[in-house]
Amino acid sequence: MRKHVLAASFSMLSLLVIMGDTDSKTDSSFIMDSDPRRCMRHHYVDSISHPLYKCSSKMVLLARCEGHCSQASRSEPLVSFSTVLKQPFRSSCHCCRPQTSKLKALRLRCSGGMRLTATYRYILSCHCEECNS
């Protein structure tokens, strides 16, 4: 009986290895998603304070978009039949930018009992999009 249980366990293990983990991605997006340099959201902590008033500063969790986009940047000359060439090149590039964000606010306590509200955008997701000139 012990040999049958061991054989069954070994067979299930072999089947899992052959089939792979069904919860993980198996398409090419998994390879791209696993690149640690890809465009993604990164968290960091920063101190928020008012530049003019004497307020107590607050430590806040912020997010930024950072990383590489898979599309290559390119510039190529434009051909013109005019003597004045206003825009001599056509450029194409992609930048890592916020895709979705939400407005957040925090209150700072200042001298004299005054309270000031600071607002900022908290980035929820990032993506690659064409850069503006």
UniProtKB/Swiss-Prot annotation:
Changing R38C: In ND and EVR2. Changing K58N: In ND and EVR2. It is found in: Secreted. GO terms for cellular component: cell surface; collagen-containing extracellular matrix; extracellular space. Expressed in the outer nuclear, inner nuclear and ganglion cell layers of the retina, and in fetal and adult brain. GO terms for molecular function: cytokine activity; frizzled binding; protein homodimerization activity. Residues 1-24 form the signal peptide. The keyword Signal applies. Its main location: secreted. Keywords: Deafness, Disease variant, Disulfide bond, Secreted, Sensory transduction, Signal, Vision, Wnt signaling pathway. One of its GO terms (biological process) is transcription by RNA polymerase II. Changing R121Q: In EVR2 and ND; reduced amount of protein in the extracellular matrix. Residues 39-132 form the CTCK domain. Disulfide bonds join C39-C96, C55-C110, C65-C126, C69-C128. InterPro entries: Cys_knot_C, Cystine-knot_cytokine, Glyco_hormone_CN, Norrie_dis. It is linked to Norrie disease: Recessive disorder characterized by very early childhood blindness due to degenerative and proliferative changes of the neuroretina. Approximately 50% of patients show some form of progressive mental disorder, often with psychotic features, and about one-third of patients develop sensorineural deafness in the second decade. In addition, some patients have more complex phenotypes, including growth failure and seizure. Homodimer; disulfide-linked. Component of a complex, at least composed of TSPAN12, FZD4, LRP5/6 and norrin (NDP). Binds FZD4 with high affinity. Interacts with LRP6 (via Beta-propellers 1 and 2). Activates the canonical Wnt signaling pathway through FZD4 and LRP5 coreceptor. Plays a central role in retinal vascularization by acting as a ligand for FZD4 that signals via stabilizing beta-catenin (CTNNB1) and activating LEF/TCF-mediated transcriptional programs. Acts in concert with TSPAN12 to activate FZD4 independently of the Wnt-dependent activation of FZD4, suggesting the existence of a Wnt-independent signaling that also promote accumulation the beta-catenin (CTNNB1). May be involved in a pathway that regulates neural cell differentiation and proliferation. This is Norrin. It comes from Homo sapiens.
